[in-house]
Amino acid sequence: ASNRGVPCSFYRTKDPIHGPYEEIKGTMEYWDPNLFLDDDGRMYFYWGCDNRTPIWGVELDPQTMSPIGEKKDLIKGNPWSRGYERFGENHSENPRSEAEIDVCFAKFLEDCGERAKDIPKENYDMIRTTFANLPYIEGAWMTKHDRKYYLQYACPGAEINVYADGVYI
């Protein structure tokens, strides 16, 4: 379960097939999550799915599922230095400048018969950013192999031929 704008609950059980499941009320909102239990018993939580925000991580208390400390920015999209994060067929599109975004956004508003001042601020930023050609950083997944940690993620967008996986070791 995940939700933007609303704290999300966790569910746990000792028997995933038959249950019962216990709901643990959430204390934070998240989208596209991954839960990682390290072999030392510490639990970590990773999430993010956006072209405006990073993949975050935080340690969780395994009993309460509450964060221990503050969330940390772990991976931010950077199509200028990681070419596999560039949009477009065959990674052919660079991020747009603010002026180019303004032109695309104005055309979108005109085509929809909308006025910028009538769009709520949270929707305005989200819609406008879709024209930036910035990569969607999503699908965080932590793996440990031979005492090394691999934080994997997907980008730039599932709708094009160059959907890719990146990894930080």
Task: Describe each model-derived feature in a short phrase.
Residues A1-I169:
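Carbohydrate-active catalytic/glycan-binding domains of CAZyme proteins
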